[in-house]
Amino acid sequence: MSRLLHRLADTFLRRTHLCYWPVRVRSGVAAGARWTLYPWSAYWRGGFEDELQRELVALGDITGWCCWDLGAHYGLYSVGLARRTGPTGQVVSFEPNPVSFDRLDRHRRMNGLTWLKPIDAAVSDAPGTAEFYTYGNLESTTTHLPYEGETRNADCAPVRVRLLRLDDLVASGEIRAPHFVKIDVEGHAHKALAGALGTLTAARPILIVAFHSELEVRGVHAILDPLGYSATRIATHSGSRDEMSGHDFIFRPAPRA
């Protein structure tokens, strides 16, 4: 019965466009921001990734900072960070999922955040295009570039997305070098960082990374450890008992000599 009621409510909210009804985010890094009612109402009701949100708030005064949000989904963290950097800062949000990107841009416009720059692409170690796995649900938070050896379900229509290299965007002046980077890209963080190695070396931003695979863990450490970063676990996001995969970590650079 509960599933039936959920489907009926879902259909009603979408057909009447009440899913776009404006609400306010109640708590967390984006507290007070304008938001849309449905879906993913936990974003505005509160209780979503509380540990990670506390770390974002704990960054303190980030006025004027540049922040990158890799895997922004609907933009909860992008909006929250942009409200804190203010117009002298810049927040760059990467979201290749077209459904999620549309909602991200809606939330940007609802809050008048002209210094939040949404980019409808994934980031990787080389520019190009790639197949994006959705498993028939573009509203999921787990749509992703393929994991190593993963093959697409033949029943799901393929979606192709752009791939961009972060160092190229910085070199061209399209985006600023970051003070902070949040990464939740479903197993692709090591490739995203490989495409930003020059910027990481020069700018030495603070990073928060959500790990989803052992390959991703090893790849990220292979990039950040030689740069003098140290990692601290801040949250478990999948009930994982593994030491690192399935957890969120904050990476801080060692002080410059």
Enumerate the language-model features and the residues they cover.
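Short internal loop-to-helix segment that lines adenine-nucleotide cofactor pockets
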Residues: R45-W68, L113, K117, T129-E131, ...
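S-adenosyl-L-methionine
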Residues: M1-T114, G173, S238, D242-A257
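Core alpha/beta nucleotide-donor-binding catalytic domains of modification enzymes
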Residues: P98-F101, D105-N137
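Conserved SAM-binding loop
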Residues: S93-P96, V185, V209
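Short glycine-dipeptide loop
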Residues: P87-T88, A202-I206
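Cap/insert and terminal regions of metallo-dependent hydrolase folds
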Residues: I206-H212
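Conserved S-adenosyl-L-methionine
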Residues: I119-A121, Y229-S238
